[in-house]
Amino acid sequence: MRRVKLLCTALMLLASHGALAVSYPLPPEGSRLVG
């Protein structure tokens, strides 16, 4: 179970970093599409 929790945490971190990297340079419309 610990490994699954670790995987979920890593995925969440990757997703949040990816969303930030994608939505930062885009205009509000683009970030609204992503989020």
Curated annotation (Swiss-Prot):
Compartments, as annotated in UniProt: Periplasm
Keyword Signal applies: yes
EC number: 2.-.-.-
UniProt keyword Lyase present: no
GO cellular component: periplasmic space
GO biological process: cell wall organization; peptidoglycan biosynthetic process; regulation of cell shape
Pathway: Cell wall biogenesis; peptidoglycan biosynthesis
Record key words, sorted: Cell shape, Cell wall biogenesis/degradation, Glycosyltransferase, Hydrolase, Peptidoglycan synthesis, Periplasm, Signal, Transferase
GO molecular function: glycosyltransferase activity; hydrolase activity
Signal peptide: 1-21
Top EC category: transferase
Family: Belongs to the YkuD family.
Protein name: Probable L,D-transpeptidase ErfK/SrfK
Gene expressing this chain: erfK
